[in-house]
Amino acid sequence: MRVGAFLGRSLFSCSHVRGALVRRRTPQHSCSFHISKPRSLSHVVPVFSRAPLFSERTAMVDQHGKHTYKDLYIRSQALSKMIIQLLGNPSHNNTPERVSFLCPNNSSYVVCQWAVWMSGAIAVPLCKSHPPSELKYVLQDSQSALVVAEESYTNVLSPLAEQLGIPVLTMSGSQNLHPSELLQEIKISQLDLDWKDRGAMIIYTSGTTGRPKGVLSTHYNLYSMVTALVNEWGWTKEDSILHVLPLHHVHGVVNKLMCPLWVGATCVILPEFCPKTVWQHFLGRDVPSINIFMAVPTIYSKLIAYYEQHFTHSNVREFVRAACQERIRLMVSGSSALPVPVLERWQEITGHTLLERYGMTEIGMALTNPLHGPRVPGAVGAPLPGVEVRTVTQNPRKEGTSYTTHAQGDSTGTMVSVGLENREGELQVRGPAVFKEYWNKRLDTQEAFTSDGWFKTGDTAMYKDGTYWILGRTSVDIIKSGGYKVSALEVERHLLGHPSITDVAVIGAPDVTWGQRVAAIVKLRDGHALSLQELKEWARAVMAPYCIPAELIRVEEIPRNQMGKINKKQLLVHFYPQ
């Protein structure tokens, strides 16, 4: 079932005729707006409720132009009315309905997200690069009651939704109307809901350890994520961020979209990542200026490659460095480990030391290097305000599992157990941003937490020299070889310093004698050759003997997902099928 709606600046209404939903054009009228401000911002509210504070400011800039906060709010309210017309009133349900949506990287995403929340429903963002089978899985697993899709995606989503009996609301960008022409009069008021514990968003994990799980966050979880980052990274309404990431992960949704919209700042969003366009924004060449940039390490590597190829003259390079230092106040890297050679080269090029931080779908951001002050390469800093972290070792017992705590801290400091300094262990997190549950997976949710309420991240970490270090996923990045524990991420950081290696993934290959052996999968620079013996000789100067790769696999490309992550379990199955 497909129902016409609006995208950008067009609107259609719908009504029931003989059991079918039909599309009817709304007449154009002049219009006055009465936007009532939220009663209080001291309680938990969704980000859309802040829009009236910044009514005429530019909220977003996309390929269609500029969009004010009032523009986004009015368009969202109109779409919300259509969602309510189709679903009844989701806000009246004890368990809100789920609404899955798929939009391009432009203002339509915000309009749809806000509209779902205005309706009292739970937003389930879909990934445009996922194959139909994965999209169908999310629709089915989330038990979505409605699919909202921009018209270019309906050919993919409509057949899937029809198989599952889910109606589809189509967003169309064919018209070019001003918001004042959308409705005769619209009065926007604060929904009378208790937002705090209400479900807000389900984001599906990348599924590197099995089928993706739906991570349900409440409005309080999102509020906590956003306000912590806004305060810690100094967001103001004068900021402007360049957005080039997908919009189905916390990094792209919360850090790069909700944070600027919370404070009245501007989000300049690109349809897709393009190195040339990003450099144009950095240098202010006939494009909107920006002063914040966040990305994954893979993107920084591609920006460096573009720089090396196109900015060859010394005067140009001096200009690039000066422009980046003058125009940009903050550059952040996350979602996967940042290779130190990339950090160092980026610092040489732009004068910026990338701010590394640590987070995941289930917890938002937990650790960050300081906005001001020294940033330790390879480390992820200290807990954000409101977040508690600890590193522990499990002590299995008949009656359950107890933990020995090595280090535990919050934003005010970290306490280290005597005799357990610099000891690695599982990183566990507690705080208001930690998710509510895995959708419809009670046992998985229960197993994800300790008996005293700490979320088990599955990452191995260490507190050392006043900062936290992530050593990798316990399941795939900690290689147990001959009694030693080897961090695959540490080995990767070293190998990326080799002049012939441009990309690398280190895995633990099965070994009858040692349990596991260190295997390096590498992409070499064009025209370069490298043997295992040559790599071993080079590595002896920079790595402990037990960390040196025992196997070298050369590939043309190392597969990564949109967030730059490598599925190492798939690599193990591919190269070691038995």
UniProtKB/Swiss-Prot annotation:
Localization annotation = Mitochondrion
State where ATP binds: 205-213, 459, 473, 565
Transit peptide location on this chain: 1-19
Which Gene Ontology BP annotations are present?
A: fatty acid metabolic process
Name one molecular function that GO assigns to this entry: medium-chain fatty acid-CoA ligase activity
> Which EC number(s) does the record attach to this protein?
6.2.1.76
**Keywords per UniProt:** ATP-binding, Fatty acid metabolism, Ligase, Lipid metabolism, Mitochondrion, Nucleotide-binding, Transit peptide
Write out the ranges of the annotated region (Disordered): 394-413
User: What's one Pfam family the UniProt record gives for this protein?
Assistant: AMP-binding
- What is a single cellular component term in the Gene Ontology annotation? mitochondrion
Q: Which InterPro entries match?
A: AMP-bd_C, AMP-bd_C_sf, AMP-binding_CS, AMP-dep_synth/lig_dom, ANL_N_sf
Protein family per UniProt: Belongs to the ATP-dependent AMP-binding enzyme family.
Its biological function? Catalyzes the initial reaction in intramitochondrial fatty acid synthesis, by activating malonate and methylmalonate, but not acetate, into their respective CoA thioester. May have some preference toward very-long-chain substrates.
User: PANTHER family this protein is in?
Assistant: ACYL-COA SYNTHETASE, ACYL-COA SYNTHETASE FAMILY MEMBER 3
> How is this protein named in the record?
Malonate--CoA ligase ACSF3, mitochondrial
